[in-house]
């Protein structure tokens, strides 16, 4: 009863926001703008009003952290290891190059623009993997600020809209094959809804293949989350050691405890993928779990939006938006060039 009293109001508020956001998203062809983006933006718009009601705080914090992890875990039901084999070795090669481009280029641009490494990393993850889902998965393990999460999702979304419009035109111009275009869209466009829109705008075959490639690309969340978790712990220890320099008794010489920093929700995510791969779960149940995962994700993004105001975003300046634009453009170009080299266009 105490839990319900403390958390229910905030959780129910985000659930209502998720329903409204889903309704608005359904009004748009191809669901070009996902419900998560609407929830985030509406939440930020309501922040000045909602922040006055402290009764919501516990529920909003619970939703933006605990329910977010649950959404990521359940998302595993949409994937299977057989999909990796289905897309083929050439597709995996392209994905490797786009991931290296997103994170390598993101790191260099982050240094150039003197950005906080967490915001830079979130934008790179959103661009290189799968938009808001990747950003949401990485944010807990690096203790990202809500404003950074909101900015990263907004930055990747803006370029996604541009790509949905230009990709089919470019595909026709370059006379790409259905599979070649599907691979390009699946590896270079970020959010799933945007991949669907860009893929099927070219052809049904291209749309089907682009979605498979996109889902396979999502599996790279696992190693990336582990790497970011380790980097964050190393930087925390480095900061502590610098603060206590000269005091040997407080100096952190011990090795990093992997079990302590390991993001266990990612292990459960893999368990869900493994269960899906066995085929023991009926499609009706896996479809329901997938829908539930998406709804919980929208709730979580809504909670993050409700905890973020536009002023905190403005503090980051214009550099992160430029960072996101350049990284997105690089990923698009690299994906196309690698496909050309492999003869897959």
From Swiss-Prot:
Q: Per UniProt, what is one Pfam family of this protein?
A: Cons_hypoth698
Which species is this record about? Clostridium tetani (strain Massachusetts / E88)
Give the family per the record: Belongs to the UPF0324 family.
Membrane spanning segments where?
A: 7-24, 28-50, 70-87, 91-113, 120-142, 152-174, 181-203, 209-231, 261-283, 316-338
Its GO CC terms are:
plasma membrane
Q: What is its main location?
A: membrane
Q: What is the protein's given name?
A: UPF0324 membrane protein CTC_01844
The protein's UniProt keywords, in alphabetical order, are: Cell membrane, Membrane, Transmembrane, Transmembrane helix
Location relative to the cell: Cell membrane
The reply on keyword Transport is no
- Which InterPro entries does the annotation name? UPF0324_pro
Does the record carry Cytoplasm as a key word? no
User: What's the protein's topology in the membrane?
Assistant: Multi-pass membrane protein
């Amino acid at each position: 009863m105490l839990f319900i009293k403390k958390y229910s109001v905030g959780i129910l508020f985000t659930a209502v926001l998720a329903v409204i956001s889903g309704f608005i998203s359904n009004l748009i062809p191809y669901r070009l703008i996902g419900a998560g983006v609407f929830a985030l933006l509406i939440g930020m718009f309501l922040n000045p009003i909602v922040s006055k009601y402290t009764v919501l705080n516990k529920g909003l914090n619970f939703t933006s952290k605990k329910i977010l992890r649950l959404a990521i875990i359940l998302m595993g039901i949409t994937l299977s290891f057989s999909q990796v084999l289905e897309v083929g070795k050439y597709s995996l090669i392209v994905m490797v190059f786009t991931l290296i481009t997103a994170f390598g280029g993101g790191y260099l641009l982050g240094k150039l623009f003197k950005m906080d490494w967490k915001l830079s990393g979130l934008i790179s993850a959103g661009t290189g993997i799968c938009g808001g889902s990747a950003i949401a998965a990485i944010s807990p393990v690096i203790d990202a600020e809500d404003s950074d999460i909101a900015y990263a999702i907004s930055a990747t979304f803006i370029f996604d809209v541009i790509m949905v419009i230009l990709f089919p035109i470019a595909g026709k111009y370059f006379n790409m094959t259905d599979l070649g275009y599907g691979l390009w869209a699946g590896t270079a466009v970020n959010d799933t809804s945007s991949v669907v829109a860009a893929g099927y705008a070219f052809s049904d075959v291209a749309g089907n293949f682009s979605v498979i490639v996109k889902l396979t690309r999502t599996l790279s969340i696992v190693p990336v989350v582990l790497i970011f978790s380790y980097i964050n712990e190393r930087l925390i220890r480095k900061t502590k050691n610098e603060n206590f320099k000269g005091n040997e008794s407080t100096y952190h010489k011990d090795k990093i405890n992997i079990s302590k920093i390991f993001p266990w929700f990612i292990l459960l995510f893999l368990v869900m993928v493994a269960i899906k791969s066995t085929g023991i779960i009926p499609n009706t149940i896996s479809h329901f779990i997938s829908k539930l995962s998406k709804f919980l994700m929208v709730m979580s993004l809504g909670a993050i939006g409700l905890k973020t105001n536009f002023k905190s975003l403005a503090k980051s300046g214009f550099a992160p938006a430029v960072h996101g634009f350049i990284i997105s453009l690089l990923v698009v170009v690299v994906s196309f060039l690698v496909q050309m080299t492999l003869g897959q266009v």
